Amino acid sequence: MKIISCIEELRDHLRGQLRTAFVPTMGNLHDGHLSLMRLARKHGDPVVASIFVNRLQFGPNEDFDRYPRTFQADVEKLEKEGVYILFAPTEKDLYPEPQEFRVQPPNDLGNTLEGEFRPGFFSGVTTIVLKLFSCVQPSVAVFGKKDYQQLMIVRNMSKQFALPTEIIAAETYRAEDGLALSSRNMYLSAEERAEAPALFKSLNAVANEVRSGHLDIFQLERQAMADLSQRGWKPDYISIRKRSNLQPPSAGDMAQGEKLVVLAAAKLGATRLIDNLEI
């Protein structure tokens, strides 16, 4: 595996490749990330991964400096997965001057759910993804469904900018007890880790109610948040949305069998967890 930080060197190595598959990450890789590499390999060759902790997507009170950096361990994992190039730029490589041009997702996608609680987050995400796409110029890129809103926004960005990159969605990788794998799970205490699967159980309970014909989504959302609060969580949202555009479904949508997804974000102790489940 080649480790490259220079954009021009990366382009030189990839010039002439017909179907490069790309997986962007912020490092601290776990089995969920590695499942993305395997899916990428099914859709393209060579596989390029990136590791870059993107300052632009962290808010002023978020954990940029605290975010775990495990570069050498990440390298070993990627080598075992047969990744061809690890693109590991420095901030100076990607931001040689202040990034004054930013991508701004549309309000109905970018300022709801995560965007409401993390202002500017999706602008930071889409700006770095667009820049990484420019560097790698992939035919396909793999994003996990765990970050469902991010996946939808990147997919829409790629479509609306007519980028020659197909966005592939990977299923959420879960521990045996249902907890979605996340780099932030390492912040959980042993007691919190034992409680953490309750978030996915809550999503399943909501989904089962919808499947059984319960159409009062606001009541379902309120009850699910109240149940988590009673267990010691601090929920930001549990919200049922249309898969197509992440807007709340109307009564007509519900009656006509619109495809839905229920999304959640909640703090357990000091750790904020997100998850979702398609209905």
From Swiss-Prot:
UniProt keywords, alphabetically: ATP-binding, Cytoplasm, Ligase, Nucleotide-binding, Pantothenate biosynthesis
Active-site annotation: 33
EC number: 6.3.2.1
Record SUPFAM superfamilies: Nucleotidylyl transferase
Pfam families assigned to the protein according to its UniProt record, in alphabetical order: Pantoate_ligase
Binding-site list for ATP: 26-33, 144-147, 181-184
InterPro entries in alphabetical order: Pantoate_ligase, Pantoate_ligase_C, Rossmann-like_a/b/a_fold
Primary localization class, coarse: cytoplasm
Record-listed (R)-pantoate binding positions: 57, 150
One Gene Ontology term, aspect cellular component: cytosol
Miscellaneous: The reaction proceeds by a bi uni uni bi ping pong mechanism.
Assembly information from the UniProt record: Homodimer.
Function according to Swiss-Prot or TrEMBL: Catalyzes the condensation of pantoate with beta-alanine in an ATP-dependent reaction via a pantoyl-adenylate intermediate.
Family listed: Belongs to the pantothenate synthetase family.
Name of the protein in question: Pantothenate synthetase
